[in-house]
Amino acid sequence: MATPRLSGIALLLTMLAVQADELPPPAYQLAAHDADIPSTVLFAIALQESGIRVRGRLLPWPWTLNIAGTPYRFATRQAACHALLQALARQNAKRVDAGLGQTNLGYHGQRFSSPCEALDPYRNLAVTAALLQEHHAATGDWVLAAGRYHRPAGGIPAARYRAEFTRQFERLLVSFKQGTPP
């Protein structure tokens, strides 16, 4: 017999999968619209940053942390918040990324009212979209903007990320044309 916690997690995963049938999901469309960026770019970034396979489908996971280069996924926002606060007490904030867009709290923590607000999916998407828009304004190109989103200093890490983003974005466009989720 499933515990209430496992049942809740299964329900959440099902809800995420149902929402992903509309691509990009409405939250991405709204955040992208507000920042005047393509929703497909925002969704591709979230898949690249926090994507996890759920029932054979790749979905962004809102309670994802990256601490000093190691990714962690949590079943609840509360658990992720607790781990985030512990990480910030132990690590330089520049080594901590949080949420759907894996926003770096050392460089962009001021965009949130508190560290745990970075785990709010809607707020994280709004910040991610705003950052992408800023990078696009500087470059005029969404692939270059994605590379700068990952590593503003550029170099080999940004080039690798641009290549990964391009593959993710092209895969999404094929999925959208076929009407199938990623």
What residue ranges belong to the model's regions?
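Bacterial N-terminal signal peptides that target proteins for export
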Residues: 1-8
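N-terminal signal peptide c-region/cleavage motif recognized by signal peptidases
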Residues: 15-17
